[in-house]
């Protein structure tokens, strides 16, 4: 490992155009999981693959679903408008009341369903993966949430500003924003911040970059550890000078375009599959959550300081094709022992993952901004993959 280096990660807010689309797609997944049980539909039977495009006062939703007939286009449109309202868009070019919403959802392909659905009771075949693919999980002990420091603090900056905006404290700031932090590492540990970038939409057209900095700098300083910002830290606040037109009115958004922001900020590999808009039969989502869960529990158990874990699946096949672990020279036991231990400690079939992490719930909209990982598990079952309740089982399996 290099003794000294810089590493940079970025985050975007819930008002970023792509994140607006992620939020809408996940709200629709949640809608099916909320309404299914009311209509007597088994949550295990719910299917959703929902993509969203947002541009100037226009939202297009397309995809495949299976769920209750009670989920009508009118129901979906209401949920979409409420999501846009909650984010904070009431601009001429993108307004929750006036945006044209086009819904193009249709039933899931029977060819896909036949490989994904569990067969009738009494058969010896299991529910298969919803697609082929590779998924990665990662954990490191460099932050309390076992996340890489650059993405951890990039998210934290924007979360603090968002909370202030929603509280009414920062009424002049709009929903759309981005952050980026360049962290200085010494001996593999984060020790300071070299560069800070915040681009934030403002609702008063003639605000200057300096005026925006006066608003956002306190939250940046609150987010970062004491002593990390020095007189050598370089600030870039609204470096283009103006950010009045924001959100989908300024830049078209699509679901699934912020996969590095959603995960580890580039500090770990990514299998390429996006999360939002997908029910948990899609291993792009559920197996990525399981990979993070396992990597985090390995680090939490003290079995490694860093851990990268890969799972691989084939469509219609239940068991993972491979399990790969790399502890980057920090492991207290060999990687092959860890690979055997995780296979013993958790059922890694799609059904096993959904059951272990309790994923058949309306818990997805909350994941759509500020990262799917490094979050706090909540009482409703959200972020269950961030628990460290498997650490003891892994120790026993070694």
From Swiss-Prot:
Keyword entries, A-Z: ATP-binding, Cytoplasm, Magnesium, Metal-binding, Nucleotide-binding, One-carbon metabolism, Potassium, Transferase
Residue positions binding L-methionine: 64, 108, 251, 282
E.C. number(s) listed in UniProt: 2.5.1.6
Pfam assignment, any one: S-AdoMet_synt_C
Binding site for ATP: 16, 176-178, 242-243, 251, 257-258, 274, 278
Ligand binding (Mg(2+)): 18
GO cellular component assignments: cytoplasm
Cofactor requirement: Mg(2+); K(+)
Principal subcellular localisation of the protein: cytoplasm
Any one GO BP annotation for this protein: one-carbon metabolic process
Span list, region Flexible loop: 108-118
Binding site for K(+): 51
Uppermost EC category: transferase
InterPro entries: ADOMET_SYNTHASE_CS, S-AdoMet_synt_C, S-AdoMet_synt_central, S-AdoMet_synt_N, S-AdoMet_synthetase, S-AdoMet_synthetase_sfam
Subcellular location: Cytoplasm
PANTHER family for this protein: S-ADENOSYLMETHIONINE SYNTHETASE
Family: Belongs to the AdoMet synthase family.
Purpose: Catalyzes the formation of S-adenosylmethionine (AdoMet) from methionine and ATP. The overall synthetic reaction is composed of two sequential steps, AdoMet formation and the subsequent tripolyphosphate hydrolysis which occurs prior to release of AdoMet from the enzyme.
Record-given protein name: S-adenosylmethionine synthase 2
Protein source organism: Rhodopseudomonas palustris (strain BisB18)
